[in-house]
Amino acid sequence: MVNTTISLGEVRQDLVRAHNQAIAALSKPGTWWTGAQRRELALTAQLAISELEPVAPWVGISTVANKLPASLTAPKIAHDAIYRISRHAATLTREWYEKVTAEINPLAFVELCGIACTIAPVMAFRRSLGLPALEVGSAESGQPSNNEPDNIVAAQLNWVPVVGPADKDAAVVQAFTAVPETNRVIWAMADAQYIPDKEMVDPNWTRGTLSRVQMELIATRVSQQRECFY
């Protein structure tokens, strides 16, 4: 545990807002999952990240007694997938992805990845500063929108489908495009946590705190430590 005297008031407020809004969205109906399912999957992602002795990547969390609620609203394979993504991302393979998406819609899988990618940075940020965790609120009623863009295509750079034309942007840029609302939330967080997309091409851009070089050094180090190999 990090000992620190930092308060939430000392954190940039645009970053606080981005995190609050992203976590709040987890309990609302999404594109392919209900609010109850999204909240449930978010809690499984939190479990995966926080466990001192995590379940092995080849073991489905849904098969382990007393790990998940007895009554689940999301399919067990979705819980197994988000647990593994959240804790054992370096072990994922295309064969595993194809097995999962044989049982759940590939676009629902994209949204599931977005839930994991919302939980992980917020938890890590707050834990590193000794701040209390943000709680996922009660689930809101309503049905998923099932909003599917017209021009969804297969990609070479990603396992998941993307909005075409494919592979004109980096894999990380096009990864969530097939689920626009998830894409919007993830990039709103990225703008606050890292660099606004429109500023990415400027090597001298800064908020007046860290320089671009310093930011890239930290980002590279975090990526290496987290085994982010994209």
Give the location of each predicted region.
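Hydrophobic alpha-helical segments
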Residues: 1-230
